[in-house]
Amino acid sequence: MTHGTLWNKILLFALPLAASSILQQLFNSVDTAVVGRFASSQALAAVGSNGSLISLMINLFLGISLGANVVIAHYIGQKVEQNIQAAIHTAILVAIISGFFVMILGQFIARPVLLLMGTPEDVIGLAVLYLRIYLLGMPFIMLYDFGSSILRSTGDSRRPLYALTAAGIVNTILNLILVIIFQMSVAGVAIATVISNIVSSGVVIYILLHESEPIRLDLRKLRIVPRELSQLLRIGIPAGLQGTMFSIANVCIQSTINSFGSNAVAGSAAALNFEFFAYFMVNAFAQAAVTFTSQNFGAGEYQRCKKIFRITMIFSILSCGILSGIFVLGRGSFLRIYTTDPAVLEYAVQRLLIATTLELLTSSYEISAGAMRGLGHSLLPAIITFAGSCVLRLIWIATACRMVHEFWVLMIIYPISWVVTGIAMLTAYHFVCSLTYSRMKKSSSGI
């Protein structure tokens, strides 16, 4: 990562990562498609209404896993093996503890929060059932995410893809068996998801247990090292809060979607799958920006850090734009994978045309935020996200959506918030770069 041509290495890192995310969403889409086609619209809405809430509960800890990626990659750039080992074992133990915490907390808050979100009466029972079963797999989700972050910090984004592929195959087979044959509806989908998460985490942990030093995981060495925990949290908590802020805003948006009825909930859930697919291209190159910047910054290669930003931004915009265009142009065929109900399709098309069409705008803030985290600045991106996305979206819901209670009015807050957040994040990135590189030059020259 710290020597040679960058663009091909970034592609080799980002494409398997994007494939992992797309594959994961594809298998999640199987959940949606199976219940939508072989259960009922209510079952589809029950699965879809949980998406933003699940993200809210896990995003903080996913941010900490990103902190592990940054810290370990930085140590790899510095070639400090003892610190690499300490960070790895701290991260895995944090994953286990946080996974069980979210699992237990979720069992208690599932129904009250779904009711607070205004989940329709004809959906609430199925939605609670799905969420409670899904959360039983949370420790395994955390282990996979943290384990994958460790592997990616070394530049390895392929083996997490293999783990996810194995889990996805299991998930698909179990979905078909439990929903179509045993008629278990949302319970069957949730059980299949839990089992597939066990498979993916098992594969990643097996890889780490058999990895060469200093990346090898030794269960006897699992312990919290305060210094490494502090480093993980310094980067990870702001990153997690950024994701959590998005999720809070999206939970509020989901609550507003719920007010349009189960057809709107189901239609939004169907269209959201394609939104995710396009966004994952952006996220993959943002992850590349984090990892490559962190390693090169640790190695003192500051000019390469600037090149990394430019390359990841270009690739992100191009890949997301192409994928979004394909989905929008073929929207009729794609959306019918999930539902053939005309009332549901009407809402799905609205979301697809407004949000998915402009998904490439997310590159502006995701790549900038990733590059800043790679430089060790994680708090500023979180603050900008809070103001530009969370606060702005909540204001829009409280004002514009109340004045004009139309589905399309709710949807246009997505591109509006992306533009505002993007402008602020790009400005912050250039400020951070100027300040950081100036300090490094003075330090290296002994001033």
Set out the residue ranges of the language-model regions.
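Short alpha-helical transmembrane segments in multi-pass integral membrane proteins
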Residues: 1-14, 72-137, 170, 181-237, ...
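Residue-level signal for short hydrophobic patches within transmembrane helices
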Residues: 3, 7-26, 30, 53-60, ...
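Transmembrane helical elements of multi-pass membrane transporters/channels
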Residues: 12-31, 133, 144, 167, ...
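Helix-terminus/linker motif at the lipid-water interface of multi-pass membrane proteins
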Residues: 26-45, 114-121, 177-186, 244-277, ...
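Membrane-helix interface/capping residues of multi-pass secondary transporters
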Residues: 32, 41-44, 81, 110, ...
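Small-residue hotspots at the loop-to-helix junctions and early N-terminal turns
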Residues: 39-52, 127, 131, 190, ...
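Small-residue-rich hydrophobic transmembrane alpha-helices
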Residues: 44-104, 141-160, 254, 267-325, ...
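Short runs within selected transmembrane alpha-helices of multi-pass transporters and secretion channels
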Residues: 65, 134-152, 160-171, 189-204, ...
